[in-house]
């Protein structure tokens, strides 16, 4: 033990007496293994980084200030250039085919706002469906993305999410025997709408040809529940044709709603190729006419999609027939193919053409017309113009039947 202690003392004293022979060479910071001096220590210039083609292009191009200020390169395009459709070759080598790109005026933002998530949570919590989701509507980010729920619009889809028909343009699920109706749906729908503090709501439904009444009584009961919870609520109903049963059409029309909507979807000549074989253009006209006869004060509404290959004369003929049965409101929108299994788009109609047809419809005497590439039947249905018309009619005492009268009419039809 004493020997070890003496040895440690010797080593310690030897280390203290080591002579300093010169300055210590600085070690490079790049690695612990090298003993070469760093450029900063020797004063030698650093080696310049090799330039690349990408860097040269960036340096030679416009600056951020040029981009913001604009210039000749950023001048507005002529309509012919702005509306020109672009194509691309897609597919594996040897089997590429030309595809038309979606026009810029049809592109919309991805829905991701907080309000979108809140609305979706409310709907799922009450087991409700919306046509916004089921039909893959491109406007969902706009309609659901308001800063608060009162600014948002959602079209509730009644009677489930499965339709008994198979139209070639629609992405809603189809089945000959969908699940039975939810008896709590009318109450849940009224509850959800009362939570949102909306002033205008749109109800629609899938076609239920498996039911004796097509779901008309279920539809009418939902309207009555909404009016009971909030009599001032303006309700628009977008219904099916009930296989031509006009008594069911009149039943829904007398339920207390404010706007009766039924879509003809396309011109008469293309109806057999676009819609399910059980739906016809003339049958849709009879539905709209029956609704107006049941309630002459009722606003009736329909919608057409453009881009199926319709001609101008066919559109003129469709508008003339719609006016002949007293339709008040018409909308035009661009057909957009949901999946490859659906009918292809024949033409992308430009915004200028949509504006032209809006003016033509108003000149023919339609009360209101919404026309644009992204317009859908229930898109911004509660426009200020329609709301003002309805409120004026209500103030004048021509708003139709009361909730009590509507319930009595439904009860009578049920017996």
Swiss-Prot record:
Species annotation: Aspergillus oryzae (strain ATCC 42149 / RIB 40)
Residues involved in [4Fe-4S] cluster 1 binding: 132, 137, 143, 378
Ranges of Low complexity composition bias in the record: 33-47
Record's GO cellular component terms: mitochondrion
Stated name of the protein: Lipoyl synthase, mitochondrial
Record field: compositional bias (Polar residues): 22-32
Cofactor remark: Binds 2 [4Fe-4S] clusters per subunit. One cluster is coordinated with 3 cysteines and an exchangeable S-adenosyl-L-methionine.
Main location: mitochondrion
């Amino acid at each position: 033990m004493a020997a070890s202690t003496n040895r440690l003392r010797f080593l310690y004293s030897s280390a203290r007496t080591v002579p300093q022979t010169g300055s210590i060479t600085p070690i490079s910071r790049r690695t612990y293994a090298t003993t070469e001096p760093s450029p900063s220590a020797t004063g030698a210039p650093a080696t310049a980084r090799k330039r690349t083609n990408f860097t040269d292009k960036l340096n030679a191009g416009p600056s951020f200030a040029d981009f913001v200020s604009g210039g000749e390169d950023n001048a507005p395009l002529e309509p012919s250039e702005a509306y020109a459709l672009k194509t691309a070759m897609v597919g594996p080598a040897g089997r590429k085919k030309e595809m038309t790109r979606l026009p810029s005026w049809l592109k919309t933002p991805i829905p991701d706002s907080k309000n979108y998530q809140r609305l979706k949570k409310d709907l799922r919590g009450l087991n409700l469906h919306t046509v916004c989701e089921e039909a893959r509507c491109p406007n969902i980010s706009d309609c659901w993305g308001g800063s608060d729920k009162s600014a948002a619009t959602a079209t509730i889809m009644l009677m489930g999410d499965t339709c008994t028909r198979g139209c070639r343009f629609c992405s809603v699920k189809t089945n000959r025997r969908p699940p039975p109706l939810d008896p709590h749906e009318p109450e849940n729908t009224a509850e959800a709408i009362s939570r949102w503090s909306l002033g205008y709501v749109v109800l629609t439904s899938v076609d239920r040809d498996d039911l004796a009444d097509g779901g008309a009584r279920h539809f009418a009961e939902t309207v009555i529940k909404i009016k009971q919870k909030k009599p001032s609520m303006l309700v628009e109903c977008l219904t099916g044709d009930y296989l031509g049963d006009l008594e069911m059409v009149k039943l829904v029309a007398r339920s207390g709603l404010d706007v009766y909507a039924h879509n003809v979807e396309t011109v008469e000549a293309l109806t057999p190729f676009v819609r399910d074989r059980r739906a016809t253009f003339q049958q849709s006209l009879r539905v709209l006419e029956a609704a107006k006869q049941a309630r002459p004060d009722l606003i009736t509404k329909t919608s057409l999609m453009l881009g199926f290959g319709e001609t101008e004369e066919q559109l003129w003929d469709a508008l003339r027939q719609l006016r002949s049965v007293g339709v008040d409101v018409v909308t035009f929108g661009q057909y957009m193919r949901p999946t490859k299994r659906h009918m292809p788009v024949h033409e992308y109609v430009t915004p200028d053409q949509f504006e032209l047809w809006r003016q033509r419809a108003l000149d023919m005497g339609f009360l209101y017309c919404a026309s644009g590439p992204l317009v859908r039947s229930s898109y911004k249905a509660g426009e200020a113009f329609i709301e003002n018309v309805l409120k004026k009619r209500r103030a004048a005492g021509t708003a139709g039947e009361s909730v009590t009268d509507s319930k009595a009419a439904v009860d009578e039809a049920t017996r």
